[in-house]
Regions:
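Short, intrinsically disordered terminal tails adjacent to the first/last structured region
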Residues: 390-411
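Cytoplasm-facing juxtamembrane segments at the starts of transmembrane helices
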Residues: 36-48, 95-117, 131-142, 160-178, ...
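Long, internal scaffold/assembly segments composed of regular secondary structure
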Residues: 176-269
Length: 411
């Protein structure tokens, strides 16, 4: 998740960018602890982590990088990170028994609670962690805090107290530590060593991802995580490709056009309900949507931000790349390792290309962050392949990697 979060901050911000670490951490945990409903868990994790991406925190970081407002910035980042982790944990827990009525009820509960918190705390800015004097941002953290509490309560009422409470509480702790201390790394670095032109923001993201991933892995190891069973085959490759394209387009369109401060949360809840009804759609929500966001981000930077070429061909290429990616998602359905490597390396290659097309020149690919992305992805691939080779040498081992062989997850 450390790699996923670092990528999220570079190749796709907002909720769609946050789906990258969500999908990657779910795939990693399902690889370490094999189960049959991998794509369903990955969909709930991708959307659950993605929801927190609707929170604004750029101006909160603006506080932590100044000595006189450091502690207010620290409090704001720690609180927002904790809420991010708690809500994501609760949504993931809902994915362990994704009955349609349960998911529909959970989506409604989250929406109502978010609206209450937004309307009575965030909109009037009663407690505010952004800059009131300079383009004040519409915060949503209180709405998501109430959403997390309401969803845990709802899942407890539905008989899922243990995983919901444990994932939410541990996510709250890991997210709070990760974002609070991660922000401190950036703040203290820029306050005391302003002459060093380092990627302080990226170091913050890596640390946040590490702590968030650790929290989710601990919760996974110490919670009841029932397997909801086989996802089932789709209606045929051609129809599934069309359906995958439709749900991908719908999630983007609803998120961009719904007149709400938490449009992605509303759209994500609707899509998760679709997943609970048509479980074969889960892989496209978890992986195809995530990659499409990455591809569209690169097209935007190529055409608008870096002005390397016209927008039309760039966005057309992004759509074609997403279709090809979706086809491989169908082809490798059921192979957790291949799917994880597909998503991970597609994102890393996209990041390398984005470094290369920067106006300052292709020399950017030797940036230590770019090199770090490649090395971390290579390390993940090497560890998975080393485990397969080691397992094949044991006469009684199964083809699926075991958690015992891998040790406790380091995500």
């Amino acid at each position: 998740m450390m790699l996923g979060w670092g990528l999220r901050g570079f190749i796709g911000g907002g909720p769609f960018g946050a789906m990258i670490p969500g999908a990657m951490v779910a795939l990693t945990l399902c690889y370490l602890y094999p189960r049959r409903d991998v794509s369903v868990i990955a969909a709930f994790a991708a959307v659950g982590v993605g929801i927190g991406g609707e929170m604004t925190y750029g101006q909160t970081i603006g506080f932590i990088v100044k000595a006189d407002t450091f502690w207010w910035g620290f409090l704001g980042l720690a609180l927002k990170g904790a809420i991010w982790g708690a809500l994501a944990g609760a949504v993931i827990a809902m994915g362990f028994r994704p009955r349609p009525l349960l998911v529909l009820g959970g989506a409604v509960v989250m929406a109502v609670a978010t609206q209450i918190g937004w309307k009575f705390i965030n909109e009037p800015k009663l407690i505010y962690f952004s800059n009131l004097l300079d383009r004040p941002r519409p915060e949503i953290w209180a709405g998501f805090l109430l959403a997390a509490l309401a969803l845990v309560g709802y899942l407890a009422w539905q008989g899922q107290l243990q995983p919901a409470l444990r994932f939410a509480v541990v996510g709250f702790i890991g997210g709070g530590i990760g974002f609070g201390l991660g922000g401190s790394i950036q703040g203290l670095g820029r306050i005391f060593t302003p002459e060093l032109k380092l990627h302080w923001w990226k170091y913050m993201e890596f640390f946040f991802g590490y702590c968030f991933g650790w929290a989710l892995s601990w919760a996974w190891q110490h919670s009841e995580t029932p397997d909801s069973g086989e996802v089932g085959a789709g209606p045929g490759d051609a129809i599934e490709m069309l359906a995958g394209a439709a749900v991908t387009a719908a999630l983007f369109w609803l998120s961009w056009n719904t007149q709400s401060r938490f449009a992605y949360s509303l759209a994500g809840g609707a899509v998760l309900y679709v997943v609970s009804r048509c479980r074969w759609m889960a892989k496209h929500v978890a992986y195809t949507v995530t990659f499409t966001g990455v591809a569209l981000d690169l097209a935007k930077y190529w055409s608008k931000e870096y002005q390397r070429g016209p927008a039309g061909p760039a966005y057309a290429a992004a759509v074609v790349a997403s279709v090809i990616f979706g086809w491989y998602v169908i082809r490798w359905n059921g192979d957790t390792r291949k799917t994880l490597e597909l998503l991970m390396w597609a994102c890393v290659v996209d990041a390398v290309v984005k470094f290369a097309i920067h106006p300052s020149g292709i020399v950017n690919v030797v940036d230590h962050v770019c090199i770090g992305f490649v090395l971390m992805a290579a390390a993940v691939s090497w560890m998975m392949r080393a485990e397969i080779i080691a397992g094949s040498c044991e006469p009684s081992s199964s083809s699926a990697p075991s958690a015992a062989a891998m040790g406790s997850p380091s995500i």
